[in-house]
């Protein structure tokens, strides 16, 4: 029961804040542990989410949960709530995140046509994701490793998202 109330409060609050800000906030990862006493939420937007947005969302979710009369633990505020953005070096978990990282350096572990593990590091050129994409995929231009990242001179590689094992945006210094 508590988990359902928490999920409902999160969904309603995100919907309201998205409507007022004009920027759609979406959940990357959510975890409700210890019977609802520990709530961890990772959110993002297509432009990236700021610390201020996380704080505002956290305050709004907390207020909604504390106003919940159906659960005494929630209404008394006896829970920990953590709202954050995806960290640097964290794997991509939601297809929509690829759109935000177009043009950036990404390392992808995937399975090729023979189901053999492969890895490519390169510039994310294209992301065909969402309901309009018949075959969700990403296109990457490989780069050579070294101090100066430059293209490897190979044609871009298109990888079906169903074949992606792990994808992590790389920091470029």
Curated annotation (Swiss-Prot):
GO biological process, one term: translation
Domain of life: Bacteria
Cellular component, GO annotation: cytosol
Gene3D superfamilies named among the record's database cross-references: RimP-like superfamily, N-terminal
Keywords associated with the record: Cytoplasm, Ribosome biogenesis
Predominant cellular place of this UniProt entry's protein: cytoplasm
Similarity field: Belongs to the RimP family.
Its job: Required for maturation of 30S ribosomal subunits.
The name this protein goes by in its record: Ribosome maturation factor RimP
Organism of origin: Chlorobaculum tepidum (strain ATCC 49652 / DSM 12025 / NBRC 103806 / TLS) (Chlorobium tepidum)
Taxonomic classification: Bacteria, Pseudomonadati, Chlorobiota, Chlorobiia, Chlorobiales
